[in-house]
A protein has these predicted regions:
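Feature captures C-terminal
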Residues: 1-46, 50-54, 61-64, 100-102, ...
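Glycine-rich phosphate/diphosphate-binding loops and the adjacent beta-loop-alpha structural elements
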Residues: 75-116
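Secretory-pathway-linked proteins and extracytosolic
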Residues: 71
Length: 273
C-alpha cells in the first residue's frame, strides 16, 4: 500500500487542511477473460479509488535485477548439513497438527509424535546459543508456529534458513522468575487448547511433561532446567532466569500473556535476527 497525502500550504509554512488516499498497487494482468468480462473488470478497477493499476518501472526493475541476483547467490551459500530429516510438527501427539510435515515419514515418525518438531527444537537451541554468546541466557523459548518448514536431510543453505524463519523477528532477552516461566508455558498450552497450535512452546535448556487434558495451571509437570554444568535440575520458582525469545511472543502475542506483563526494566532487545 502506498499513501497519497494532500497537504496544501498557506504560503507561510503551514496548512489548514489535510487529506489523503491509500493506493493498493496492482498489476494489469487479469488472466484470460472474454472481452466483455475484461472490460467490466477494468471498469470496476477504475471505479475504486484505492486501487491503482501500475506497470513496473523499467529503470527501477533493471537496478533491482542486479540485487536480486546477489540475493539469489547469497541464498545458495551452504551453512550446514542435516544428517537426517528435521521434521516440522507444532504439537506432539496425533490429535492436533498431525499432518504438518511435507517430508515422507515425518508425520508417522514415533519420535515426532512423542516430542514434536525436530526443526522447532533446533531453532530453540540455536536461540539459546545466540543468547549465551551475546549477553548471556539461561533458557530459550520459541513458538512452534514461528517455524514454517521442514529441513530435508542434506545441505542446508542460507535460503533454507530464511524459509524456516521468514519473519523479521529479533531476539529479546527477558528476566523472569521460575514461577513466571512456568506461567508462560501454561499460557502457551492454554492457547493451544483454545485452538492455536502455533503457540505450542519449544525451549532450550528446559524440559517438561505436558497433559493437555488437565485444567489451566496444572498442565505442565516435571519442569526442569539444564544448568551451566549440563545437569538437569528442578526449576527453582523463586530464582530469576534470563530467557531469550523472539520479539513477537516477548510482547505477549500468541497467547503468551505473562511475557506481555513484564516491564521495560526486565526486557532487552538484542537486535539479533
Amino acid at each position: 500500500v502506498v499513501g497519497g497525502l494532500d497537504l496544501p500550504s498557506d504560503g507561510h509554512g503551514g496548512g489548514n487542511s489535510c487529506a489523503g488516499q491509500p493506493h493498493i498497487l496492482i498489476g494489469s494482468t487479469l488472466g484470460t477473460l472474454p472481452a466483455d468480462a475484461l472490460a467490466a473488470a477494468r471498469a470496476d478497477l477504475a471505479s475504486q479509488p484505492a486501487l491503482r493499476v501500475t506497470e513496473p518501472d523499467a529503470a527501477a526493475s533493471a537496478v533491482l535485477a542486479e540485487y536480486a541476483e546477489q540475493v539469489k547467490d547469497f541464498g545458495a551459500e551452504p551453512v550446514a548439513v542435516a544428517q537426517q530429516n528435521l521434521c516440522l510438527r507444532r504439537v506432539p501427539g496425533t490429535k492436533r497438527d498431525a499432518s504438518r510435515s511435507k517430508l515422507d515419514g515425518c508425520n508417522q515418525d514415533a519420535h515426532v509424535i512423542a516430542h514434536g518438531g525436530d526443526v522447532q527444537q533446533l531453532v530453540a537451541e540455536a536461540f539459546l546459543r545466540q543468547g549465551q554468546r551475546f549477553g548471556g541466557a539461561d533458557v530459550s523459548l520459541q513458538n512452534g508456529g514461528g517455524v514454517r518448514v521442514d529441513l530435508a536431510a542434506g545441505p542446508v543453505t542460507v535460503g533454507h534458513i530464511y524459509t524456516v524463519l521468514p519473519f523479521k523477528n529479533t531476539l529479546v532477552a527477558l528476566s523472569l522468575t521460575g514461577a513466571e516461566l512456568r506461567a508462560t508455558l501454561e499460557d502457551a498450552m492454554q492457547s493451544v487448547v483454545a485452538g492455536n497450535t502455533g503457540s505450542y512452546p519449544y525451549a532450550g535448556a528446559l524440559r517438561w511433561q505436558v497433559d493437555l487434558r488437565q485444567p489451566l495451571g496444572q498442565r505442565i509437570g516435571a519442569l526442569e532446567h539444564r544448568n551451566a554444568q549440563g545437569q538437569w535440575v528442578a526449576l527453582d520458582e523463586a530464582a530469576t532466569y534470563r530467557m531469550i525469545t523472539n520479539d513477537f511472543i516477548a510482547a505477549g502475542q500468541d497467547g503468551h500473556t505473562t511475557l506481555g506483563t513484564l516491564g521495560a526494566d526486565r526486557r532487552e532487545d538484542t537486535f539479533l535476527a
